[in-house]
From Swiss-Prot:
Pathway: Energy metabolism; oxidative phosphorylation. This is Cytochrome c oxidase subunit 6B1. GO terms for biological process: oxidative phosphorylation. Disulfide bonds join 30-65, 40-54. SUPFAM superfamilies: Cytochrome c oxidase subunit h. InterPro entries: COX6B-like (IPR048280), CX6/COA6-like_sf (IPR036549), Cyt_c_oxidase_su6B (IPR003213). Keywords: Acetylation, Disulfide bond, Membrane, Mitochondrion, Mitochondrion inner membrane. Component of the cytochrome c oxidase (complex IV, CIV), a multisubunit enzyme composed of 14 subunits. The complex is composed of a catalytic core of 3 subunits MT-CO1, MT-CO2 and MT-CO3, encoded in the mitochondrial DNA, and 11 supernumerary subunits COX4I, COX5A, COX5B, COX6A, COX6B, COX6C, COX7A, COX7B, COX7C, COX8 and NDUFA4, which are encoded in the nuclear genome. Residues 27-73 form the CHCH domain. The modification N-acetylalanine is found at residue 2.
């Protein structure tokens, strides 16, 4: 169990620097990567392509965004009340 956690920590990669968001506050970066992931996933699904190319965006928003925000946004997408353009 402890070895598994050590392996996860060792292999964990955080979000890389994005020059569009140079400030300390990364809220907009979180939001943009969440939108980009869902847009990419929607576009690749429509084309019949492989959605694994969108995985980078998912890793970045999972690294930056609080879990409560992501779950709330996922709920809003499911309800059809999400404010962002996907």
């Amino acid at each position: 169990m402890a070895e598994d956690i050590k392996t996860k920590i060792k292999n964990y990669k955080t979000a890389p620097f994005d020059s569009r968001f140079p400030n300390q506050n990364q809220t907009k970066n979180c939001w943009q990567n969440y939108l980009d992931f869902h847009r990419c996933e929607k576009a690749m699904t429509a084309k019949g392509g492989d959605v694994s190319v969108c995985e980078w965006y998912r890793r970045v928003y999972k690294s930056l965004c609080p879990v409560s925000w992501v779950s709330a946004w996922d709920d809003r997408i499911a309800e059809g009340t999400f404010p962002g353009k996907i």
